Regions:
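Catalytic Cys-His active-site segments of thiol-dependent hydrolases/isopeptidases
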Residues: 133, 195-197
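Glycine-centered tight beta-turn/hairpin loop motif at sheet-sheet or coil-to-beta transitions
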Residues: 127-128, 191
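Surface-exposed, glycine-biased beta-strand/turn segments
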Residues: 35-120, 125-126, 138, 165, ...
């Protein structure tokens, strides 16, 4: 398992050669807020590494998904403390306690429970980082290491651990600054935040094409 994960990470690092410049923005969210598109273009990263990535084995990040509740981009502050803020991820509503699955094989580089993100995990997959927020559980230490512990859910995830795509890494909770049970899912490519919805669309297109191709053979 460890050898396969390392090989996959190496392939993902090479995928940056296929960087594709996309002009699509979170227009639905921006339109709902009535914000100027030119302001969004100036501040919202719009480079997404889509070409060259093989996401046929990637996983949707939450079980019992109900709805997308807040898109990537500018929005009104959910708690009313700001007129607008930049939302660095995609919120996915699911019943509290629903399991969260790792999107893509990688290594856990950070576990935390002391920010607005609540109990959270950051996983590195080549040039990609995926961030999971508002999870159940807390961060504990043992033998000089740190890990996310959710005993009720049977989850124990250590910093430095290799995690395959689709593995259960936590559960939807209400830690941090949530307005209801949901997963906040953030994505970075080469240290820049990108719109997770764009990546999901590319992933679904690849997976649908793979299914059609296998049926035709």
């Amino acid at each position: 398992m460890q050898r396969n994960s390392r090989a996959l990470l190496g392939g993902q690092a090479a995928a940056q050669l296929g960087l594709l410049l996309l002009s699509g923005l979170s227009l639905a969210g921006l339109g709902a807020l009535g914000l100027r598109q030119e302001l969004a273009k100036a501040l919202e990263p719009n480079q997404v590494a889509v070409a060259g990535n093989d996401w046929r084995g990637a996983s949707f990040p939450v079980e019992n998904f109900q709805a997308y509740t807040s898109p990537f981009g500018y929005r009104a502050s959910p708690d009313g403390t700001y007129n607008q803020e930049f939302h660095k991820g995609l919120d996915m509503a699911a019943p509290e306690g629903s399991y969260i699955r790792n999107w893509w094989a990688g290594r856990v580089v950070e576990v935390s429970d002391n920010t607005a993100c609540g109990t959270s995990i950051v996983i590195q997959s080549g040039e990609w980082q995926h961030i999971y927020c508002h999870m159940k559980g807390q961060i504990e230490t043992s033998g000089g290491g740190r890990y996310l512990s959710d005993r009720t859910g049977g989850i124990q995830i250590w910093e430095g651990q290799l995690v395959p795509a689709g593995a259960r890494i936590g559960r939807v909770g209400m830690t941090g600054r949530p307005t209801g049970p949901h997963l906040h899912w953030g994505l970075k490519y080469a240290s820049r935040y990108v719109d997770p919805a764009m990546v999901l669309r590319a992933m679904f297109a690849q997976q649908s094409g793979s299914t059609i191709s296998s049926r035709s053979q």
